[in-house]
Swiss-Prot record:
Protein name (database record): Deoxyribose-phosphate aldolase
Compartments (UniProt record): Cytoplasm
Pfam families attached to this UniProt entry: DeoC (PF01791)
One GO-annotated biological process of the protein: deoxyribonucleotide catabolic process
Keywords, in A-Z order: Cytoplasm, Lyase, Schiff base
Enzyme class: lyase
GO cellular component, one term: cytoplasm
HAMAP family in UniProt: DeoC_type1
The reaction(s) this protein catalyses: 2-deoxy-D-ribose 5-phosphate = D-glyceraldehyde 3-phosphate + acetaldehyde
Organism: Mycoplasma mobile (strain ATCC 43663 / 163K / NCTC 11711) (Mesomycoplasma mobile)
Domain of life: Bacteria
Length: 217
């Protein structure tokens, strides 16, 4: 199995330069990755550079903390879509979620989805900051929200994608909502294990190394 078309080739570090983004774009085209995932200020630039290719543009919203106002997130999402984003990866308000303000979290996801039209929304719940009950509750919120994907992590917290968390997602969601694993995916074995658990999209900055490893097998 080839994982190329399941990978969001990702560059989200604060210090990313134009040269870094150009390299990301070139690699995504060369290896046939599903998307290039960048911070929202890069969307217009990346969209222009990807013109004529099948690679999608994915933008993060409310990243990495998820703690800004709902209005700010909705505006960022709309602007990213207007600039050409095909997909949005948003971070939920984790503090509000942990305060049991589940209606707030659900409403925020729905409001972002509303401004996206038919574009794909992935919802990051940051599993590292939740216990097992929290992961289940957050998964159920995503199930009600109309989002196309649930996503494990930003890659900026204590840990990233874990097989056991993907299994919890799958048990609750079945095939109703797709699963994206991200954070700490460093090699082909990581990706295979997460795929077996139910993940069908992968966010990683190690994509080139992983597909080269895949090519040797």
């Amino acid at each position: 199995m080839k994982f190329n078309n399941m990978i969001d080739h990702t560059l989200l570090k604060a210090e990313a330069t134009t040269k870094d983004v150009d390299k990301l774009i070139a690699e995504a085209k060369e290896y046939g990755f599903k998307s290039v995932c960048v911070n929202s200020s890069w969307v217009k630039y990346v969209k222009e550079k990807l013109k004529g290719s099948d690679v999608l543009v994915c933008a993060v919203v409310g990243f990495p903390l998820g703690a800004m106002s709902m209005q700010a997130k909705v505006f960022e999402a709309k602007l990213a879509i207007d600039h050409g984003a095909d997909e949005i990866d948003m971070v939920i308000n984790i503090g509000r979620f942990r305060d049991d303000q589940h209606d707030y979290v659900l409403n925020e996801i729905k409001k972002i989805k509303e401004v996206m039209g038919n574009k794909v929304l992935k919802v990051i719940i940051e599993t590292a900051l939740l216990d097992k009950k929290g992961i289940k509750d957050a998964t159920n919120i995503v199930l009600q929200s109309g989002a196309e994907f649930i996503k494990t992590s930003t890659g900026f917290s204590y840990s990233g994608a874990q097989v056991e968390d993907i299994e919890v997602f799958k048990e609750i969601l079945g095939d109703k909502v797709a699963i994206k694993a991200s954070g700490g995916i460093k090699n082909l074995n990581d990706m295979k294990n997460l795929y077996k658990a139910g993940a069908r999209r992968f966010g990683t900055s190690a994509a080139v190394a992983i597909v080269k490893e895949q090519g040797k097998q």
